[in-house]
């Protein structure tokens, strides 16, 4: 609790000092949420409550970088740069946008025993501008390498700007830097992998990667996914199951560290199917169990009241 007060009357004002949590580094550009709650009791003894949240930070501007998780070298990576107030209102800003190739570790680091999932996944939820602790198993912590692209940017009244950058297969980090109206630096970052789906070799030194352009497909199309390992050699066991029946089961190819998994989707597969991946290396099991949605888009329910 930051402050509290009592009042009498039909209007009131609350003033408090929005002090930061000093255990959170200012370098991470944190945003703090302060919630004001009021309990009002009328003359009959009935109490009503309401609350309002206020956001405060070291800067008056927030910036983000967005891009789809699935990227291939066949087409440019499309980035969306956004600058907003801490309350999410669009704000115009200008600055620089750069893309760096990352310095990969000399060898693949196996996953920690405490983790129950592959040690790196897109959209892990880490704050975009947070600098994680050095960890060769976590690409978000890898050091920056050579600059691949650098350019100025300017968001307009909408607070957004779209850019496209052609990139070869590999792993990169996009970095944005701008300033708020008080001249304080605001940053954002996004780690991105670009894949070459025609290659037999997975180019990033992580133990296990499983990705797909879409996890919802329609009958008449083909589901596509990619499995890869950064080890010099490695094979995974792949199973595709539908309604407790195995559609296909196979080992990824010998002599390759990247495999494209494809499955033709039929009408009979509506409701979805499951892709299971089993890969074991250096006493670590990397297991995937992903449901691919095949929606009942051919069925429509209409409800009417008369």
Where are these regions (language model features)?
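A structural signal for beta-strand and strand-to-loop patches characteristic of beta-rich domains
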Residues: 1-306
